[in-house]
Amino acid sequence: MDTFIQQIINGLVLGSVYALVALGYTMVYGIINLINFAHGEVLMVGALTSWTVVTALAPFGLPGWALLLLGLIAAVIVCSALNFAIEKIAYRPLRNAPRLAPLITAMGMSLLLQTLAMIIWKPNYKSFPILLPGEPHMIGGAVINNVQILILVMTVVTLSSLMYLVNRTKLGRAMRATAENPRVAALMGVRPDTVISATFVIGAALAALAGVMYAANYGSVQHTMGFLPGLKAFTAAVFGGIGNLAGAMVGGVLLGVIESLGAGYIGDLTGGVLGSHYQDVFAFVVLILVLTLRPQGLLGERVADRA
């Protein structure tokens, strides 16, 4: 039972990261029908930016929470500026192009960001400092540390704030109007280009937060670290129903729990033939099953393709 509780905790923490990144995928797709495959690399840039700030300021004797906060602020600023530039330079000129063109561009942008990060930060793994030390907390026989608690709290606060922004603010109404019909929204005074740029910036901020939390929890950063979390977050978005904010949240958390439980019990289920290092397989098994059985996702609705 203790193992089960521990895996649930680990899954909720991992799923929180997936949910934050999945929201970026689903927001962009909901407005311009683009799968931004460079989104995982934005997470990576956020983590590496935070690492740079934290290691640069650590010798000044700042407390761990202050270093983490400053690293997070720097990551959000850099990632927001980066995603704003990507949207304006790489995606906006292709907005009316065949759908394959921006998809290929997104893949190319992903490789470009990985290469630039490798040049700037070098290809070796870097240790992310332990910024919130302290005795772990016991829940039954399971353990949760300060960073994991922070991830869960930050995720709940962030997701609640995002839902409020989308449903209760002027920007949120403009985003929903643009997603429904950008031409009609423009006639009603909405500026679609501004709304789309704002969506990319918000998605980047979420990815930056996820990147910093991911690095703080797992303790290392590297230029390829965003690929798998980004791919799994895309799986989570599809799992929950891409284009649906609640679906991205639910899909991310469920995928994290499924992956964690799979890693914890796969050895017992296969008689030791397979180990926990096969945990990545579960995310893609889920993707295949969802695309086969319910392609619109758990909370998505089957709709006609827009012209």
Segments (PLM) and residue ranges:
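Membrane-embedded helix boundary and interhelical linker motif in transport proteins
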Residues: I31-A85, I89, Y265-V273
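Helix-loop-helix "hairpin" substructures at the membrane interface of multi-pass membrane proteins
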Residues: V143-Q222, G240, L245-G251
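Single transmembrane alpha-helix segments in multi-pass membrane proteins
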Residues: F4-V54, A85-A101, A237-L245
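Inter-helical junctions in multi-pass inner-membrane proteins, predominant
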Residues: D2-V17, I144, L165-K170, I196-A237, ...
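Transmembrane helix-bundle core of multi-pass membrane transporters
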Residues: P93-L94, R99-R168, V195, L261-D280, ...
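Membrane-interfacial amphipathic/re-entrant helices at transmembrane-helix boundaries
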Residues: M1-V21, T49, F60-L70, A97-A101, ...
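Hydrophobic alpha-helical transmembrane segments of polytopic membrane proteins
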Residues: L20, Y25, I77-C79, K232-L255, ...
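Alpha-helical transmembrane segments within multi-pass membrane transporters and channels
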Residues: G61-M109, L116, V250-L255, E259, ...
